[in-house]
Amino acid sequence: MPVKRSLKLDGLLEENSFDPSKITRKKSVITYSPTTGTCQMSLFASPTSSEEQKHRNGLSNEKRKKLNHPSLTESKESTTKDNDEFMMLLSKVEKLSEEIMEIMQNLSSIQALEGSRELENLIGISCASHFLKREMQKTKELMTKVNKQKLFEKSTGLPHKASRHLDSYEFLKAILN
């Protein structure tokens, strides 16, 4: 037997069913990030005006200015000042490291009184003192190497890169002259 099917759409169609208030529209694609697919939370999160975009991408848009700043000419003076400041900070760290070692010893004695390893696991008392001493020694060695290299460059008049490419004869000749 044939089955008769009919769609009763007359009740569903109304005259105002196509009003803009009833049609749900998708959000603008512009508000979504192409990399993450997430919606932008704030309108002020990234610059939207072209002037702000120019300032933000100035270097990448090949609008580079020549770098004749006075700060670049003073870079040699600032490196010596930075080196001196670094050495002063290093000496402060050495002094403070001794205090830290004393505090760690006190904590380890407290740990011995407690009889548990929870304090050691929490703070890491057992190996921290060795690491601190080792790092301080490495930093000192590196700073002395840097200072020796700078003194060598000043005495020979050769830049560091040029001294790398010399063979032993040219190196000795440069030192003697």
Swiss-Prot record:
Domain characteristics, as noted in the entry: The DD1 domain (also called RepD1 domain) mediates the corepressor function and is essential in the triggering of apoptosis.
Chain segments carrying region Disordered: 41-81
**Any Pfam family hit:** CENP-R
Q: Where does the source fall among the domains of life?
A: Eukaryota
Where in the sequence does UniProt note compositional bias of the Polar residues kind? 41-50
- LXXIL motif: where is this motif? 172-176
Recorded coiled-coil stretches: 83-113
Q: Effect of altering residue 89 to R?
A: Abolishes dimerization, but not interactions with nuclear receptors
Gene Ontology biological process terms in this record = apoptotic process; cell adhesion; cell division; CENP-A containing chromatin assembly; chromosome segregation; negative regulation of epithelial cell apoptotic process; positive regulation of epithelial cell proliferation; regulation of DNA-templated transcription
Q: What does this protein do?
A: Transcription coregulator that can have both coactivator and corepressor functions. Isoform 1, but not other isoforms, is involved in the coactivation of nuclear receptors for retinoid X (RXRs) and thyroid hormone (TRs) in a ligand-dependent fashion. In contrast, it does not coactivate nuclear receptors for retinoic acid, vitamin D, progesterone receptor, nor glucocorticoid. Acts as a coactivator for estrogen receptor alpha. Acts as a transcriptional corepressor via its interaction with the NFKB1 NF-kappa-B subunit, possibly by interfering with the transactivation domain of NFKB1.
Q: How does it assemble?
A: Homodimer; mediated by the coiled coil domain. Isoform 3, but not other isoforms, interacts with the cytoplasmic tail of integrin ITGB3. The relevance of the interaction with ITGB3 is however uncertain, since isoform 3 is mainly nuclear. Interacts with CCNA2 and MTA1. Interacts with NFKB1 NF-kappa-B subunit. Component of the CENPA-CAD complex, composed of CENPI, CENPK, CENPL, CENPO, CENPP, CENPQ, CENPR and CENPS. The CENPA-CAD complex interacts with the CENPA-NAC complex, at least composed of CENPA, CENPC, CENPH, CENPM, CENPN, CENPT and CENPU. Interacts with TASOR.
| Gene Ontology cellular-component terms listed | cytoplasm; cytosol; inner kinetochore; membrane; nucleoplasm; nucleus
Q: Where is this motif: LXXLL motif?
A: 9-13
Q: In which tissues is it expressed?
A: Widely expressed. Expressed in spleen, thymus, prostate, ovary, small intestine and white blood cells. Highly expressed in testis and colon. Isoform 4 is expressed in platelets, lymphocytes and granulocytes.
**Name recorded for this polypeptide:** Centromere protein R
Return the annotated region ranges for DD1.
20-50
Question: What does the entry say induces or represses the expression of this protein?
Answer: By estrogen.
Q: Which UniProt keywords apply?
A: Activator, Apoptosis, Cell cycle, Cell division, Centromere, Chromosome, Coiled coil, Cytoplasm, Isopeptide bond, Kinetochore, Mitosis, Nucleus, Phosphoprotein, Repressor, Transcription, Transcription regulation, Ubl conjugation
Consequence recorded when altering residue 9 to A? Decreased interaction with nuclear receptors
Record location of the Glycyl lysine isopeptide (Lys-Gly) (interchain with G-Cter in SUMO2) cross-link: 8, 22
Residue numbers of Phosphoserine PTMs? 17, 28, 71
Sequence motif: Nuclear localization signal, positions: 63-66
